[in-house]
Amino acid sequence: MTATAESKQRSFPKIEFTDSEAGALEFPSSRSRTFTYYTPAKKRSTMYEDVTVDVQPDPDRHLSQGWIYGFGDGPGGYPQEWTAAKSSNWHAFLDPNEEWDQTIYRNNSKVVHQVELCLSNAKRARVYDGWNTPWLTFISRNLGAWMHAENGLALHVFTSIQRSCPTNMINTAVAVNAAHKMRFAQDLALFNLDLSEATENFDGTAHKEVWQSAPEWQPTREVVERLTAVPDWCELLFGSNIVFEQLVGTLFRSELVMQIAAGNGDYITPTIVGTGEHDYDRDLAYTRNLFRLLTRDPEHGEANKELFGTWLAIWVPRCLDAARALQPIWSQPADKAITFATSFDAATDKFRSLLEDLGLDIPKELDQ
């Protein structure tokens, strides 16, 4: 048998480039040995950006096939319809505090250590023995009542919405806000317990009755409870950090407690309340950035301003009623270093400045 001289012709498929091979796509840092799949805010990406940006993708970014998870009887993922506010790019928001999982524990740990050291030194030096009875009563009733407001906001406002926002950057900032509130409420509870053990003149149970039935605190309690019933996460954030905290929170903490404590021989309370004030300064920074982004949005800015105006019309009157109802507690301490009118004017001036920064109209109720 002889082999055929002719060799069989072989055919090969035509090579087609689909741009799926390595190195085909150009993106930031694509020619570097290390790369990122997003554009950093500055020249180099930060740790915060690396662990938060696009960790929660959506159909507008990367999920071309749509949401890959969701409830069986509901929308998939994190719908933007969970708020009436609109944005042309929710992913443009970055937390100016650059908070992420590690910083929550690191920063809160420092504050907890500071509070524990302050309280242990106070007990060792027996500083509570020098406090007058009216001041002990003021702390037990009013600072104790404020503990309930902080705890309510922590558990039923910020914790409830920290997975409702459309991007991981907003959700992380809200989660940190919840951790701040929760820790501050626990600090106030620890302070209450220490005072109860240190002196017989301090009623460590008075705060519960005050929060539930004292006339001066009922409007504040009503606002907090109304906030917990709001389904729109953006309105919750607006009503809490923009309106309630400005007109009621800073009025009580900054413009009363921090102003009169030293005059009543108390250098412990300002240390503890000051941690809550520092937390709110950081929380207000991210809140201001978020709502400034929404009011300056090229597509939805004007509609958002109109929406926020309706929210102001709802929450400003309620918070003003709560603030004015607190007026009697300004006369309770023995040393009255500041009047309610002075404190109220300072709080409303800060609120006006914040609204002007956001480009919102000043509510007429502030001039009444």
Curated annotation (Swiss-Prot):
Keywords: Monooxygenase, NAD, Oxidoreductase
Keyword NAD: yes
One GO MF term: oxidoreductase activity, acting on paired donors, with incorporation or reduction of molecular oxygen, NAD(P)H as one donor, and incorporation of one atom of oxygen
Enzyme class per UniProt: oxidoreductase
Induction statement: By propane.
Enzyme Commission numbers on file: 1.14.13.227
Matching InterPro entries: Ferritin-like_SF, MP_mOase_hydro, Phenol_Hydrox, RNR-like
One Pfam family per UniProt: Phenol_Hydrox
Family note: Belongs to the TmoE/XamoE family.
SUBUNIT field: The propane 2-monooxygenase multicomponent enzyme system is composed of an electron transfer component and a monooxygenase component interacting with the effector protein PrmD. The electron transfer component is composed of a reductase (PrmB), and the monooxygenase component is formed by a large subunit (PrmA) and a small subunit (PrmC). Probably requires the presence of the chaperonin-like protein PrmG to ensure a productive folding, resulting of a soluble PrmC, which leads to the active form of PrmABCD.
Protein name per its UniProtKB record: Propane 2-monooxygenase, hydroxylase component small subunit
